[in-house]
């Protein structure tokens, strides 16, 4: 093998190493940026949900409207499950959200296994306000799961206390 061939092979190998390193670094950077963007989006949706929930709930209570079959759908606890289902009609980026419970009155609001695990985690870590982790469902599809507790406050028990009082 001539010196010229050896130099070209060495340069080719060096170029391959540099390109591989650049690809690996770029991939890690892009993955981190995508994760940061997904976390930002999750926090934005959460903030909007909580602000909407608080304003509508307060408005409903202050309005003096009776809570009955005709008006209960206006309360966030009832409307948010419908809003979360309709959200996909307006946004195709894969974000889904819901409000769930480990003891729901409405079976449609039952927490899944990942959400139940998050609830147990928040009970063990009550000072934490959010949690993000990667999960893989039973179909092998991966997601970024953002969870944040909605703690029960005294005014919540007006509707969410004893069934006979609701």
Predicted regions and their residues:
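Extreme N-terminal signal-anchor transmembrane helix of membrane signaling/transducer proteins, especially
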Residues: 1-28
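Long, amphipathic alpha-helical coupling/dimerization segments that relay conformational signals between
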Residues: 6, 34-37, 150-152
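Extracytoplasmic ligand-binding sensor domains of the Cache superfamily
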Residues: 48-54, 58-153
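The canonical Cys-X-X-Cys-His
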Residues: 150-166
